[in-house]
Swiss-Prot record:
Top-rank lineage group of the source organism: Bacteria
Family: Belongs to the sulfur carrier protein TusA family.
Name of protein: Sulfur carrier protein TusA
InterPro entries in alphabetical order: Sulphur_carrier_TusA (IPR022931), TusA-like (IPR001455), TusA-like_sf (IPR036868)
PROSITE patterns attached to this UniProt entry: UPF0033
Purpose of the protein: Sulfur carrier protein involved in sulfur trafficking in the cell. Part of a sulfur-relay system required for 2-thiolation during synthesis of 2-thiouridine of the modified wobble base 5-methylaminomethyl-2-thiouridine (mnm(5)s(2)U) in tRNA. Interacts with IscS and stimulates its cysteine desulfurase activity. Accepts an activated sulfur from IscS, which is then transferred to TusD, and thus determines the direction of sulfur flow from IscS to 2-thiouridine formation. Also appears to be involved in sulfur transfer for the biosynthesis of molybdopterin.
Chief localization: cytoplasm
Active site: 15
Organism: Buchnera aphidicola subsp. Schizaphis graminum (strain Sg)
Example of a GO biological process term: tRNA wobble position uridine thiolation
Length: 76
């Protein structure tokens, strides 16, 4: 069974909306599925790593040098 790739475009959303949308999306996903998050809110550089840590998801990679910021998450 092929896994689908999920890209979540959160450009234009401001805190706390990006985390709320990520959480809602991850709840619908299965364990070990991956999601690519695109965001431009500077607070995501702090919020997404903490969110992953506390919710026991993995932050596999992040690209935060230029906008849009990109985060690759794996559901825990």
């Amino acid at each position: 069974m092929e896994k689908k790739n999920i890209i979540l475009n959160l450009i234009g959303l401001r805190c706390p909306e990006p985390i709320m949308v990520i959480r809602k999306t991850l709840r619908k996903m299965k364990k070990n599925e991956k999601i690519l998050v695109l965001a431009d809110d500077p607070s995501t550089k702090r919020d997404i790593p903490y969110f992953c840590y506390f919710m026991e998801h993995q932050l596999l990679d992040r690209f935060i040098h230029v906008k849009p910021y990109r985060y690759l998450l794996k559901k825990g």
